[in-house]
Structures are given as C-alpha cells and as structure tokens.
C-alpha cells in the first residue's frame, strides 16, 4: 500500500520566466487554488509567487477567492501533526476541464509543508477567512493562541487567552471567535466555566459574562455558532448566547441528540450531523424553527468503517451539494466520492476546515 500522497517535483529550470512577476501573478490569480500544489513544483520562483501577499490581493480584487479544504492528522501520535489540502492529481490537472471521466478519480489530499508545526487539538481549531486559529495547545492548561496562514502556510503568534484553560472549544460568529472552556476555581481543585471572545480584526480578547447558575455547575466543552447565536453544550444540556442582544437562553435538549461527537459542522447557518448506523451513514440537519433534527433527504450513503489494508488505512472524501426545497426540507446530492489519502493505521484524525483564499 502506498504512503501518504506526495508529488515528485519537476527538475528545476535554469532560466527564470521572461514574463514580469505582475503579469504572472495576474494569470495565476485566475486559476483555481486546486491547481496550486501542482504549480508549486514548476520552479522556486513559482513557489515564492504562490505564497506572496500580492497574489492573494489580486485574487480578492478579481473576486476569485474560494473555499479550500484543510485536514489535520497525527500520522504518528508521538510526532507533530501533519496538514493536507485538497487538490487535483497531477495526471488530472490538465485534462479535468475537458475529460468525460468522473471527477471522483481526480482529487487527492496533498501534504502541506510547514516550517514550524504546532501541536493542536480538534475542538480548538477554527477558520476565519484565510486563517486557521489554534486556541491553546495540546498541553493542559494552556492560554497560547497561534494563527496558521493558509496563503503562505506559516504560523504566527496571536494574543494569548486572558485565562489558562484546562478544556477549550471554539466557534466563529461575525468574524469573532467565541471560546468556551474551564479553568481552576481559585485554590480549590474544582473547575469553573469561563467564556471569552476574540475579535479577529482588532486582535483583542474580551470576557463574556455568565448570568445563569446553570452554566456555573456544568463544564461546557463543546460550542458552535449558528442562527446568529453561540451555542455551548455539556453532556445533555445546551445554552445559547445572542451577542447582539447580550441574552442567554436554555436550548431544547433535542439539539444534543446527534451532536455528542465531533461529526458535525455548520454550513450556511445550518447545523449538520453524521451518524453511523447498521443501516448505513445517516445525515441530519437541525431545524432551529421546529427545534428538532431532520433527515437530509436524497442521500443513500453506504456504511462507513475501518479495515486493515496491509497496515494502512484509506481516507475517503465525498462532496455533497445541498438544496433547500419548499415544504420538504433540505436535500443532498453526492457530486463525487473517492479515496484521497493512505495513512498509517495508527493515525489520529484531528479536524478538517474550510479556509477562504
């Protein structure tokens, strides 16, 4: 079985491109980000241009920004995490626009080369624009915050949390990162809840007051943002916070039914969840108006599980388009479904995120 997908770089060219950098940037800015990992092997000068701020300014001016998938894995539990990004295979890049072949064979997770990798944990990784924020590190307690720039693939430091947290979970709403966590309660061995908010524009932390006694007796370690509210959960209880009104509310317990794991995400202000059953993989979405989970119609996904492939595991990826229909909920359609990466069987999945670049 093959090892994680890697592309072999082409021999370096001895001559520099005769075209000026500004013209090359203007051309590359019009190309989908799916091609960038392949273009990076053209030459060192190309690699430099692909990470330049000028390129992404041009992409923004041309309205060519797009969502890019990033995946974080621990291939070895004793090593730093590895990052991957979804791209086109080299043998598909030039022909994908005109070929009649199915798209399912044209995508792969390519390794992202990072000079100084950081320790991460899934609940504390969030994407805001072209940046991925790592709230704290894997060593507890922690308060450090770092930013992964998805344009240059480099880390930089951000202002630390005002308190040291033992547990942490983060969500994004209107460009602000809302963090739920627990910290030591004075000199006692008990833990107390603390909620903080980080403005990514001003790079300033602020405290979110906790008015309910309910939140003072439960350690809230999972959070997300939908419907212009920040939802924070612990076990079978969920509270929501409306930042514009400064109001906390208790939420129906139904929301916790299929959100007990990390197999959930928010897409265009709707919460989706995935559950593995003996009948197959079931997708659901949460109807905030009715206060209950509803099945995502139109999908017939096979049961997903794990199996030994010569000491390796295969990671598969699916792209599902979503359509909201009148009086019939939300429907899904599988665009493509394919094997995108082979990893050691000891790997540990952390998180996948979509950054806008």
From Swiss-Prot:
Gene3D superfamilies xref list: Kelch-type beta propeller
Cross-referenced InterPro entries: F-box/kelch-repeat_ARATH, F-box_dom, Kelch-typ_b-propeller
SMART domains, per the entry: FBOX (SM00256)
Methyltransferase keyword on record: no
Kelch repeats: 131-175, 177-224, 226-267, 268-313
Record carries keyword Signal: no
Matches recorded under Pfam families: F-box (PF00646), Kelch_FKB95 (PF25210)
Domain (F-box) ranges: 14-61
Entry keyword set: Kelch repeat, Repeat
S-S bridge residues: none
Organism expressing this protein natively: Arabidopsis thaliana (Mouse-ear cress)
Name used for this protein in its record: Putative F-box/kelch-repeat protein At5g38680
């Amino acid at each position: 079985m093959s090892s994680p997908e890697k592309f072999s770089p082409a021999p370096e060219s001895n001559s520099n491109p005769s075209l000026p950098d500004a013209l090359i940037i203007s051309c590359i800015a019009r190309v989908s980000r799916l091609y960038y990992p392949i273009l990076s092997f053209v030459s060192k000068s190309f690699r430099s241009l692909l990470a330049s701020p000028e390129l992404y300014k041009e992409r923004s001016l041309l309205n060519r920004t797009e969502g890019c998938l990033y995946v974080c894995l621990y291939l070895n539990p004793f090593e730093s995490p590895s990052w991957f990004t979804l791209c086109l295979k080299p043998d598909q890049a030039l022909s994908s626009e005109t070929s009649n072949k199915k798209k399912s064979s044209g995508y792969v997770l390519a390794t992202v080369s990072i000079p100084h990798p950081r320790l991460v944990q899934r609940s504390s990784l969030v994407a805001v624009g072209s940046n991925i924020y790592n709230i704290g590190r894997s060593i507890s307690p922690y308060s450090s915050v770092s930013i992964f720039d998805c344009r240059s693939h480099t880390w930089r430091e951000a202002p630390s949390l005002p308190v040291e947290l033992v547990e942490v979970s983060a969500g994004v709403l209107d460009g602000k990162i809302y963090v739920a966590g627990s910290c030591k309660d004075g000199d006692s061995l008990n833990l107390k809840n603390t909620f903080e908010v980080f403005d990514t524009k001003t790079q300033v932390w602020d405290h979110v007051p906790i008015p309910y006694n309910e939140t003072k007796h439960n350690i809230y370690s999972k959070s997300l943002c939908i419907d212009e509210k920040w939802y924070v959960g612990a076990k079978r209880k969920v509270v929501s916070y409306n930042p514009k009104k400064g109001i906390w509310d208790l939420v129906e317990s139904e929301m916790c039914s299929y959100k007990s794991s990390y197999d959930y995400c928010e897409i265009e202000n709707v919460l989706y969840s995935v559950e593995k059953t003996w009948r197959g993989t079931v997708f659901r979405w949460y109807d905030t108006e009715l206060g209950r989970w509803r099945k995502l119609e139109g999908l017939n996904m096979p049961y997903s599980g794990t199996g030994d492939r010569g000491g390796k595991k295969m990671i598969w990826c699916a792209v599902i388009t979503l359509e909201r229909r009148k009086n019939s909920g939300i429907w899904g359609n599988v665009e493509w479904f394919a094997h995108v990466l082979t990893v050691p069987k000891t790997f540990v999945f952390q998180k996948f995120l979509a950054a806008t670049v």
